[in-house]
Amino acid sequence: MLQPKRTKFRKQMTGHNRGLAQRGSKVSFGEFALKSVARGRLTARQIESARRALTRHVKRGGKIWIRVFPDKPISKKPLEVRMGKGKGNVEYWVAQIQPGKVLYEIEGVSEELAREAFALAAAKLPLATSFVKRTVM
């Protein structure tokens, strides 16, 4: 599971997830990519689950890049605990996703196989996504 090795602070405030993705919105490593068209949060488990679906479908062919990293801690108080007494412990880590963010990239496979693999991966994610190709500059 992905999570930071160390952080400056253990817990974070909830904050807002506004705007569009400026960084990480272009296909920069692979040939094809899975791009988010919605806003939301991806947990480390969801990122790993989609990665497994991708790698299993392409088998040994192709190289895969994960372009998102869960760096935001989400805390939760235990069940049946009264309010107050401080913020709960960190339960899991999430990556905040804005529309236009590239989530996964792949290269070394045909477009048809890439589309199938990304369809399987997208089914594991709670966001609406789209398939994009690299544009030659």
From Swiss-Prot:
Entries under Pfam families matching the protein: Ribosomal_L16
Report if keyword Ribonucleoprotein is assigned. Answer: yes
Q: Which UniProt keywords apply?
A: Ribonucleoprotein, Ribosomal protein, RNA-binding, rRNA-binding, tRNA-binding
Q: Which GO terms describe its molecular function?
A: rRNA binding; structural constituent of ribosome; tRNA binding
Gene Ontology BP terms: translation
Instruction: Extract the InterPro entries matched here.
Output: Ribosomal_uL16 (IPR047873), Ribosomal_uL16_bact-type (IPR000114), Ribosomal_uL16_CS (IPR020798), Ribosomal_uL16_dom (IPR016180), Ribosomal_uL16_sf (IPR036920)
Region feature (Disordered): 1-20
* This protein's record includes keyword Endoplasmic reticulum: no
Compositional bias segments (type: Basic residues): 1-13
Task: Provide GO CC annotations from the record.
Answer: cytosolic large ribosomal subunit
Looking up CDD domains in the UniProt record yields: Ribosomal_L16_L10e (cd01433)
Q: Which family does it belong to?
A: Belongs to the universal ribosomal protein uL16 family.
Record's NCBIfam families?
rplP_bact
Q: What is known about what this protein does?
A: Binds 23S rRNA and is also seen to make contacts with the A and possibly P site tRNAs.
Family annotation (PANTHER family): 50S/60S RIBOSOMAL PROTEIN L16, LARGE RIBOSOMAL SUBUNIT PROTEIN UL16M
**Quaternary structure, from the entry:** Part of the 50S ribosomal subunit.
Descriptive protein name: Large ribosomal subunit protein uL16
Q: Which organism is it from?
A: Pseudomonas fluorescens (strain SBW25)
